[in-house]
Regions:
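Beta-propeller and closely related beta-pinwheel folds
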Residues: 53-67, 104-112, 148-313, 350-356
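Hydrophobic or amphipathic alpha-helical targeting/insertion segments
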Residues: 117-154
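Generic beta-strand hydrophobic packing signal
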Residues: 67, 138-139, 148-151, 165, ...
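Short beta-strand element of the conserved SAM-dependent methyltransferase core
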Residues: 84, 114, 131, 140-141, ...
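A short, charged
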Residues: 126-130, 135-136, 161, 166, ...
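Beta-sheet repeat architectures centered on beta-propellers
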Residues: 1-101, 105-124, 258-273, 279-280, ...
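Membrane-entry segments of alpha-helical transmembrane domains in multi-pass membrane proteins
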Residues: 78-81, 127, 225-228
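Short beta-strand segments and strand-loop junctions that repeat across beta-rich extracellular domains
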Residues: 87-97, 139-143, 181-204, 241, ...
Length: 495
């Protein structure tokens, strides 16, 4: 039966795809949102497959647990240098060279906190990367020759053996916390002197020191995050703000309770917001109030969290997107031992996307790029979201966008759907499945997208009072893009 366009009485569109929204059930929510989606990009009006992954560096024969990059302020033309901790050693990799070079070894931990800074060496300014952990104390990698030096901190007799788990930078000083035996203490160095932490009695503003903030509840400081013009100091149950420019004006104030213990490796800041994972979901602190983002918007997804596995959660923030790797069950009976899902939260647009198919062990946001290690291949550092890649190391990824149920007027039966959209792909003949599902049955048409951008018109003959649209691809490791949304037209019969 041929259908002429004049016979269509109804239409709906997905005008500007946004993300996953599960706060209002699965029926008649705004069609800009998917009730279920995975591995989809929606920025700037696109509905597209997510970028894939690629190998970022030569493999290192040990499990990388820290990755950082030199900030080349003094020698901006030099090749990028990356620093990794693995197997009790520190390695460097200079972009464009053969591989990793071991610079020092014999460390007890591979999980280091780091800050970039500079120091003087023979009258010249040198970039340094300062690293610390609670077992090994502080070391520094020098940008001039990539040597590693152990640093014995000058803190004063009372704190001779302090080793910081976490470092921060604020008011031209290095800050440290998480030292064993000092759960309530935050230390700060002298200005521009990162290895001297003693006070100066005559001129306190030029000295280092310590701020003590007991909460008498067994809690301890786990993170220091620069935030606007001040520093956030985070305990598992409480967020504190440190303000001021020197010791005479430093103040620490309790800002907010965190709504249950915060997962240490999930804390990230992005210009105007701090994000973290707690028992009740993803929290956002904007300097004034605390909001739970995921409790509603990702209700179904977070309901399937694997209990007892939040400690494996890892996060980073890059270009205003918060990436959080977690264990999310597919079915109630699943037992997971490693992260299988990444939740992406766009802090500017306020939208969520779910990523599947990667088993993230650790995340690293370095120099505007997201890197990660996989649970099954921790020796490799992979690039996350590589625009040149349409799959996972060349293997296809499954992309899905599923609208909520739409009744489009309960009094009518809908039939004979026509979908219209404009699309292209990274290769020719990339199959994308277009499915209309009604309460009666579902029907799928496979559309082969081409490199050349084209307009498509897809007829699907199926009927029902309620319907949903599913867009899915899984056959080729090639990216695809739909521009300007999808329009669906259909005929109506009174029920």
């Amino acid at each position: 039966v041929s259908i002429s366009d004049s016979d269509y009485q109804g239409r709906f569109t997905i005008p500007t795809p946004k993300g996953v929204y599960q706060a209002a059930g699965d029926t008649n929510i705004n069609t800009d949102y998917a009730y279920l989606a995975q591995n989809i990009r929606t920025e700037r009006g696109l509905l597209a497959s997510s970028y894939g992954t690629s190998r970022a560096f030569p493999a290192l024969g040990a499990q990388i647990e820290t990755l950082a990059r030199f900030y080349r302020r003094t020698r901006p033309d030099d090749a990028d240098v990356y620093v990794a901790a693995a197997g009790g050693a520190i390695y460097t990799y200079t972009m464009g060279t053969e591989g990793w070079v071991k610079r020092s070894e014999g460390y007890k931990s591979d999980v280091w906190s780091s800050v970039t800074y500079e120091t003087t060496e023979g009258g010249a300014t040198v970039d340094i990367l300062i690293l610390s952990n609670a077992k090994d104390g502080m070391i520094a990698v020098y940008g001039s020759d990539l040597r590693v030096e152990k640093k014995a901190l000058t803190i004063g007799d009372a704190y001779a053996e302090v080793k910081f788990a976490t470092l921060g930078r604020h008011a031209e000083r290095i800050w440290g916390t998480g030292a064993e035996g000092y759960p309530d203490s935050i230390f700060y160095s002298r200005p521009y002197d990162p290895f001297n932490w003693t006070n100066v009695a005559e001129t306190p503003e030029l000295g280092g020191g310590v701020i003590n903030q007991p909460t008498w509840d067994g809690d301890k400081f786990i993170a220091l995050e620069p935030f606007g013009g001040y520093l956030l100091a985070v305990k598992e149950q409480t967020i504190f703000e440190i303000r001021g420019t020197d010791p005479s004006s430093f103040t620490i104030t309790e800002a907010y309770g965190t709504d249950g213990p915060v997962e240490e490796r999930s804390i990230c800041t992005d210009r105007t917001s701090m994000l973290y994972l707690s028992q009740n979901g993803i929290g956002l602190y904007d300097g004034n109030t605390l909001r739970l983002l995921s409790r509603d918007a990702l209700y179904e997804t977070m309901r399937m969290r694997m209990e007892g596995m939040d400690g494996a959660a890892r996060a980073c923030v890059c270009n205003h997107i918060y990436y959080l790797a977690m264990c999310i069950k597919e079915s109630e009976s699943d037992v997971l031992s490693e992260n299988n899902t990444v939740l992406e939260y766009d802090t500017e647009r306020g939208t969520f996307m779910v990523r599947k198919g990667m088993r993230v062990k650790d995340f690293f946001s370095v120099g505007g790029t997201v890197y990660f290690t996989q649970a099954d291949e921790p020796f490799e550092v992979l690039r996350y979201g590589d625009p040149e890649s349409g799959g996972y190391l060349g293997a296809p990824m499954e992309c899905l966008w599923e609208t909520p149920w739409l009744d489009l007027g309960k009094a009518y039966m809908k039939r004979d759907f026509v979908l219209r959209f404009t699309a292209d792909a990274d290769e020719n003949d990339v199959p994308v499945e277009m499915t209309i599902k009604t309460e009666r049955r579902e029907k799928t048409r496979v559309v082969l997208l081409q490199r050349q951008r084209k307009d498509y018109r897809v007829k699907i003959q199926v009927s029902g009072v309620r319907m949903k649209l599913k867009i899915r691809s899984h056959a080729k490791a090639a990216g695809w893009r739909i521009y300007g949304g999808v329009q669906a037209e259909y005929s109506l019969d009174e029920v």
